[in-house]
A protein has these predicted regions:
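The feature marks the mature, well-folded catalytic cores of soluble enzymes
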Residues: 1-122
Length: 122
């Protein structure tokens, strides 16, 4: 909280399939995020609606099968995600975002995908 000068807002996940926030929420920029609606309790959904102007739903089948909720947007323009999430990719394209598909199926077997593989530096 102090390092980034941001408020921490707790969100509750209600489904075991979405065991980390990075499996069901992908911030694109300060106004836009992808999310899996069924992963969050009602109170958390309200918080998300207040926090983002644009919430784009990730189809649940793509979140579960392809880890579409584990994508990463480093710059507000490019979204790196596991290949195969055609519906989510179409939604992102309609927003003018460029999707970079990568193959992470071996990492998915261990419970992670793109977001879990990145390294950030500040």
């Amino acid at each position: 909280e102090d390092h980034f000068n941001l408020d921490i807002i707790p969100l509750k996940l209600k489904r075991e399939e979405f065991y980390h926030l990075d499996t069901c929420l992908v911030p694109i920029d300060s106004a836009t995020a992808l999310f899996v609606e069924s992963a969050f309790d009602k109170e958390s959904l309200v918080k998300l609606q207040h926090g983002f102007e644009n919430l784009i739903p990730i189809p649940e089948d793509e979140a579960l099968k392809n880890f579409a909720g584990n994508a990463f947007c480093p710059d507000g323009h490019h979204v790196v995600m596991q290949s195969g999430s055609k519906k989510t990719m179409k939604l992102l394209g309609q927003l003018g975002l460029e999707v970079l598909e990568v193959e992470t199926s071996e990492f998915i077997k261990g419970g992670g995908s793109v977001f879990c593989l990145k390294g950030m530096y500040f």
